[in-house]
Amino acid sequence: MFAIIETGGKQYKVQQGDVLKVEKLEANPGDVVEIDRVFAVSKDGELKVGAPTVEGAKVLLKVEDHGKGKKIIIFKYKPKKNYRRKQGHRQAFTQVRVEAIQA
């Protein structure tokens, strides 16, 4: 059984027990977050696709941890003008575990 969900503007294909990193959620570690933006659910070989979401379907995610991703460097410059700007960024994420898929 799997589901396709949306959180943080991104779509994920999840199964029960999966661990994934999503955009930062405002929840404490140990909390259970309910996602109701479920676009498709596959159960017993039957695929149910929503228009745009599947009615009554939800996915329960347990928050395990918060963190920051790998650092990326933003560097811009203008040639011949001695203009250089260097900036780093680390995107915040939340690590979650899929507890249940209800459809």
Curated annotation (Swiss-Prot):
Coiled-coil positions: none
Lineage top rank: taxon: Bacteria
Keywords: Ribonucleoprotein, Ribosomal protein, RNA-binding, rRNA-binding
Ribosomal protein is among the record's keywords: yes
Keyword Ribonucleoprotein: yes
Classification via InterPro entries: bL21-like (IPR028909), bL21-like_sf (IPR036164), Ribosomal_bL21 (IPR001787), Ribosomal_bL21_CS (IPR018258)
Gene Ontology BP annotations: translation
A GO CC annotation given for this chain: ribonucleoprotein complex
Spans traversing the lipid bilayer: none
A Pfam entry, by short name: Ribosomal_L21p
Molecular function GO terms recorded: rRNA binding; structural constituent of ribosome
Oligomer status and interactors: Part of the 50S ribosomal subunit. Contacts protein L20.
Purpose of the protein: This protein binds to 23S rRNA in the presence of protein L20.
Family statement: Belongs to the bacterial ribosomal protein bL21 family.
Record's protein name: Large ribosomal subunit protein bL21
